[in-house]
Every structure is written in structure tokens, then in C-alpha cells.
């Protein structure tokens, strides 16, 4: 089980938070995503290059994965089914999560799946 901390564009962040988006589409070439991993999603604005400090991170459990061209997904990308976690799990995961990345993310309108999810 790995904890992945990910920048998430505002529209995607809100859709996950509201429960309208129970999946994540991400570039997987630089990460080894797997079922039972946790995603810590931080709302990050690509236009300002800043995190939204008014929003707490979202923690989601990866429950399912599609990562094969057989299903129409490029070999560099992965689609993950995700679900919310309990309050106790949320705290435990955040305590062990890596720090936020201060690296610049992708530019707005460019390579959205790599940075926005």
C-alpha cells in the first residue's frame, strides 16, 4: 500500500468531493499506482500555481484499476476507481502522507491528466 499525494485541479477536486467523480484518470508513467493505495488529493490552481488553503485534502482509497490499451486506455495512463474513507483512516493516511510538492505543475489547458486528474 502506497500513499500518493496529488495536485488536483479545482473542477476535478470539487467533483470528487461532491461524489460526482468516483474515479481518477492519471498519468501513471512516473508512479506505481495499485489497488489498495491511497490518494491524497490537494486542490491546486494551475492558473496561479498555488494550493487552495481553504480546502482540506481529500483522501480516497483505490478500489479498481484499468491500465490497459485493451480497454482503450493509453499505456502511460491509468483509470482508478476510488471511494471515500472513514474519519479514522483519513487521519492515519494524512499523518503518513508525503509533503505537498512545490514543483510547478502543468500549465492550464496543457496535459490536464498529468496534473489535474
Model regions and ranges:
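Compositionally biased, charged N-terminal/linker segments
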Residues: 1-29
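Short beta-strand-centered aromatic/proline hotspots
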Residues: 49-66
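Short glycine/proline-enriched turns and hinge-like loops at secondary-structure junctions
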Residues: 19, 53-55, 73-75
